[in-house]
């Protein structure tokens, strides 16, 4: 089974779409999975949406009492994961979920660790591009 860890902060408006898209991509590829949303102390409806999504099965949620940062959310999600393989993806779908399938297949082929990044930074503001380097 694959565990997909999804750190989120104030992303209540997009959670249903995120869960639906990721589950659809993995279902189409016949990959069994669990989704673990980690709410990093959101101030909006994020936790309520995660709780509602969890009722459908295959989705779990973790909730921080305050904002501890994305890295802490990722670590908490990885610690809670039950899968043989884990994948971390942002909750706003800025990265294509189809890459999960590609990387999962590489893992099945014997790779132990994988990572991804943007091939092109696109039209980001100069300060953001500088900070990312």
Go through each PLM region and give its residues:
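Short helix-capping segments at alpha-helix termini
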Residues: 26-31, 54-59
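A conserved acidic beta->alpha catalytic loop
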Residues: 39-47, 93-94
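Cell-envelope/extracellular polymer assembly enzymes that use nucleotide-activated donors
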Residues: 1-3, 34
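Short, well-formed alpha-helical segments that are part of the catalytic scaffolds
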Residues: 11-26
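Acidic helix N-cap motif at the loop->helix transition within catalytic regions
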Residues: 13-17, 43-53
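Acceptor/aglycone-binding surface of glycosyltransferases and processive sugar-polymer synthases
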Residues: 60-66, 70-80, 85, 94-133
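Short beta-strand/loop segment that forms part of the nucleotide-sugar
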Residues: 23, 31-41, 62-63
């Amino acid at each position: 089974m694959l565990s997909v860890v999804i750190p989120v902060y104030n992303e209540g408006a997009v959670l249903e779409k995120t869960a639906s898209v990721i589950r659809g991509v993995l279902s189409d590829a016949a990959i069994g999975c669990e989704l673990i949303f980690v709410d990093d102390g959101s101030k909006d409806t994020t936790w309520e949406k995660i709780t509602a999504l969890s009722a459908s099965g295959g989705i779990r949620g973790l909730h921080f009492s305050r904002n501890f940062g994305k890295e802490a959310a990722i670590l908490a999600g990885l610690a809670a994961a039950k899968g043989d393989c884990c994948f971390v993806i942002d909750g706003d779908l800025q990265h294509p979920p189809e890459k999960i399938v590609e990387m999962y297949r590489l893992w099945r082929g014997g790779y132990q660790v994988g990572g991804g990044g943007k091939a092109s930074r696109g039209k980001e503001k100069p300060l953001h591009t500088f900070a990312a380097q």
